[in-house]
């Protein structure tokens, strides 16, 4: 059974809890963000370019020393590379004297490589020529399509101009004259139209009658739908 409906005989009163002897005393709870965080000055260490270290260093001497080390390393690697390149080089066919050539001697691998290189160069040239031809054909096709599109747009524009202006409409005399007839408004034959105007302003073939049964609209309606 719930105890939510029971009356409170002893309500809570402030000043009697733990740490609440004096209500006028300020709270002693602090947040960690209210406390001072940086309480010590950080000094530069020995390897962080302190002003004393910068004054005592000789930058020119250090730069010259680094340059000498780089040149020494470069010269150390150069003879090995030159030796390897000289060993890898083989005498070409055109460099061999004619006296050393023999008809029975087979061609070396380098000659075969030269032939294959020439064949590959020819194939590459043929492929490049074919690619240029394809690009040229595509460019011509694109230009032709653009010209056709422009011509079609110009034709549609001229048709719209000629059909929109009756003075420039050159479709021929077979066109009906009814196309130039101005349409009447839907409220031209209503009863109470232009009631405030005078009788002289109205047309002679129309007369205003302030009677629904004797009006022109009622007569037309009866003749059209009843008779």
UniProtKB/Swiss-Prot annotation:
Polar residues composition bias: residue spans: 24-34
Protein's name according to its UniProt entry: Protein CWC15 homolog
Keyword entries, A-Z: Coiled coil, mRNA processing, mRNA splicing, Nucleus, Spliceosome
GO molecular function, one term: RNA binding
Function per UniProt: Involved in pre-mRNA splicing as component of the spliceosome.
GO cellular component: a single term: nucleus
Gene that encodes the chain: cwc15
Similarity section: Belongs to the CWC15 family.
Locations listed in the record: Nucleus
InterPro entries linked: Cwf_Cwc_15 (IPR006973)
Basic and acidic residues composition-biased segments: 52-84
GO biological process, one term: mRNA splicing, via spliceosome
Lineage top rank: taxon: Eukaryota
Self-association state and partner proteins as the record states: Identified in the spliceosome C complex. Component of the minor spliceosome, which splices U12-type introns.
Coiled coil ranges: 121-165
Signal peptide: none
Extent of Acidic residues compositional bias: 102-124
């Amino acid at each position: 059974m719930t105890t939510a409906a029971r009356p409170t005989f002893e309500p809570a009163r402030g000043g009697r809890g733990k740490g609440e002897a004096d209500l006028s005393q300020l709270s002693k709870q602090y947040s960690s963000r209210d406390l001072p965080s940086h309480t010590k000055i950080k000094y530069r260490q020995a390897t962080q370019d302190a002003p004393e270290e910068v004054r005592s260093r000789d930058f020119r001497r250090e730069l010259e020393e680094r340059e000498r080390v780089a040149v020494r390393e470069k010269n150390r690697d150069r003879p090995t590379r030159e030796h390897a390149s000289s060993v890898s080089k083989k005498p070409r066919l055109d460099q061999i004297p004619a006296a050393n050539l023999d008809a029975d001697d087979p061609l070396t691998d380098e000659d075969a490589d030269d032939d294959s290189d020439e064949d590959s160069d020819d194939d590459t040239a043929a492929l490049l020529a074919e690619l240029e031809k394809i690009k040229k054909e595509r460019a011509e096709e694109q230009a032709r399509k653009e010209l056709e599109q422009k011509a079609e747009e110009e034709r549609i524009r001229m048709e719209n101009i000629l059909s929109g202006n009756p003075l420039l409409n050159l479709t021929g005399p077979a066109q009906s004259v009814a196309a130039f007839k101005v349409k009447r408004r839907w409220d031209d034959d209503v009863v109470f139209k232009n009631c405030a105007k005078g009788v002289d302003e109205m047309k002679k073939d129309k007369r205003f009658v302030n009677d629904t049964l004797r009006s022109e609209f009622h007569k037309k309606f009866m003749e059209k739908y009843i008779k």
